[in-house]
Amino acid sequence: MASARNGVSKDELLPVYERRSQRDGDISGSVKSFASTIGNSASAAVLAYCLSSISMTLVNKYVVSGASWNLSFLYLAMQSFIGTVAILACKKTGLIQNLALFDLKKAQTWLPISLLLVGMIYTGNKALQFLSVPVYTIFKNLTIIVIAYGEVLMVGGGVKPLALLSFGLMVLSSVVAAWADIQNATTATVGASSDSTAAALSALNAGYAWMGTNVIFSASYALGMRRVIKKTNFDNWDVMFYNNLLSIPILLLASVLAEDWSSENLQRNFPAELRQSLFIGILYSGVAAVFISYCTAWCVRATSSTTYAMVGALNKLPLAVAGIVFFAAPVTFGSVSAIVLGFISGLVYARAKSTGA
């Protein structure tokens, strides 16, 4: 009472360390409250998913777009190694709490899926090397069609009318994109030698061939993973960990056998003036692959699978626009029409998934 009469508060009578502990507890509580708010925010989840997936595609395009680039297996091995280290670091710090210990038997069961993943990411990077980001994005929609009919063959059932309409729009957008690409290639080489035109068309044909192969690998990976994941009882982080870990020796072996590791070739692939930015891109892509996996689960948890499907459809447009902005992809009536058709097809497909029509 005397202290109160003398104008000294109760808090001032507490020992310094107790007041500091109380203050730190208040700050910690505020941080946890803010983190909880963000974690349950649908807007934050959608934004994080969109930014991570767009940036990942753009960084991959940047790394593999060098005129002399021919070390895709090595690049992907580095990416997988960085992803594995990032996952283990997250587990060590407590950010990931449900990652099980490595199981050799489960690894053997999962190995065929990792082989399909290697095929998927390698062919995807090769397609990006020859095709523009908008065209790559549009053709990627074809994977949805192959998966849908693969599921029909595996589990029966059929494809509903609205889904069929979306598939038709996807095919049409791909045809328009290819037509616009070929028109641009021939127009850009007008006045040049016939060899230049032939080289441009040859590069496009290589890109389409890699894209077609990527669609097959992507669909096979998705369909195979759904079957094997039931046997292993993996969650999202287990899938990410085993995919990255098992891919490393496969990719390294493929790189040693198929790629040139001479100092001259390494110099051509990583020129001194671009070396730092390329390595930053490789580091980012490895970490971003883990972040995309987290954001996918976050988006589904904070919203719904229907909203996630819709976001995936809407994400095609900013990704295509980003490709035009950052890599100067040609803007023509054909290319814009293909992007719009691809965007609409994604919306129709998301609607078909949500209504079952």
Curated annotation (Swiss-Prot):
Endoplasmic reticulum keyword on record: yes
Top-level division of the source organism's lineage: Eukaryota
Lineage per the UniProt record: Eukaryota, Fungi, Dikarya, Ascomycota, Pezizomycotina
Keyword annotations from UniProtKB, A to Z: Cytoplasmic vesicle, Endoplasmic reticulum, Glycoprotein, Golgi apparatus, Membrane, Sugar transport, Transmembrane, Transmembrane helix, Transport
Name this polypeptide is given: GDP-mannose transporter 2
Oligomeric and partner information: Homooligomer.
Membrane-spanning residues: 34-54, 69-89, 108-128, 130-150, 162-181, 197-217, 237-257, 278-298, 307-327, 333-352
Family stated for the protein in its record: Belongs to the TPT transporter family. SLC35D subfamily.
Role, per record: Involved in the import of GDP-mannose from the cytoplasm into the Golgi lumen.
GO biological process: transmembrane transport
Pfam family, one: UAA
Cytoplasmic domain ranges by topology: 1-33, 90-107, 151-161, 218-236, 299-306, 353-357
Compartment annotation: Golgi apparatus membrane; Cytoplasmic vesicle membrane; Endoplasmic reticulum membrane
Glycosylation site list: N184
Lumenal compartment segments: 55-68, 129, 182-196, 258-277, 328-332
Key word Membrane present: yes
Chief location: Golgi
Topology term for the membrane: Multi-pass membrane protein
One GO CC term, this protein: Golgi membrane
